[in-house]
């Protein structure tokens, strides 16, 4: 009987050694410990961006409806405060008052923003590049039949994550002609 032709491949062990497995688990743990906080911040930043875009869409809808209908259209916080995070209503406002609408005048209503996002009407003071933004008394913005901001002044909104002040907020600016843009300044969130 000759063992030279004996196939030893059948008897080899397959798999990982305990040391290889421990090294792999350790490396994976380190990567997760570093990656998860950064990923959480990325998710929060994306949530702020998405919800900012949602409100920009609402402002643009109100402006375009004012032009299309040739009459005033307003957007007002649902609860009548400076806090738009709980929701807003877009409604016909031929008197250009921004006052709470009748149910029949409402064109669109939002249930608000999800999560810990805040959206407040703010006023700007100071000079560039060190503007400061403080909560204002504005509960609505009125677009006239030409699509302009009926107040004749700029309006500002601050979008923030109330759960994490390290996340940079965003400032929305509505110009006197009604154009909505993202202000280059980042909001300092309280």
Regions found by a protein language model. Give the residues of each.
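N-terminal helix-rich module
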Residues: 1-10, 34-47, 53-60, 64, ...
């Amino acid at each position: 009987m000759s063992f030279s032709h004996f196939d030893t491949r059948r008897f080899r062990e397959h798999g990982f050694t305990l040391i290889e497995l421990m090294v792999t688990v350790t490396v994976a743990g380190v990567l997760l410990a570093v990656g998860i906080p950064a990923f959480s911040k990325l998710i929060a930043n994306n949530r702020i961006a998405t919800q900012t875009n949602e409100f920009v869409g609402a402002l643009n809808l109100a402006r375009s409806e004012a032009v299309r209908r040739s009459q005033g259209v307003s957007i007002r916080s649902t609860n009548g405060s400076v806090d738009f995070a709980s929701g807003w209503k877009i409604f016909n406002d031929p008197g250009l008052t921004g006052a709470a609408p009748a149910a029949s005048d409402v064109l669109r209503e939002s249930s608000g923003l999800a999560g810990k996002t805040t959206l407040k009407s703010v006023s700007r003071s100071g000079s560039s590049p060190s503007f400061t933004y403080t909560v204002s008394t504005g509960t609505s913005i009125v677009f006239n039949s030409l699509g302009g901001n009926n107040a004749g002044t700029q309006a500002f909104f601050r979008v923030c994550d109330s759960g994490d002040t390290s996340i940079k907020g965003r400032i929305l600016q509505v110009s006197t002609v009604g154009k909505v843009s993202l202000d280059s300044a980042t909001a300092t969130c309280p």
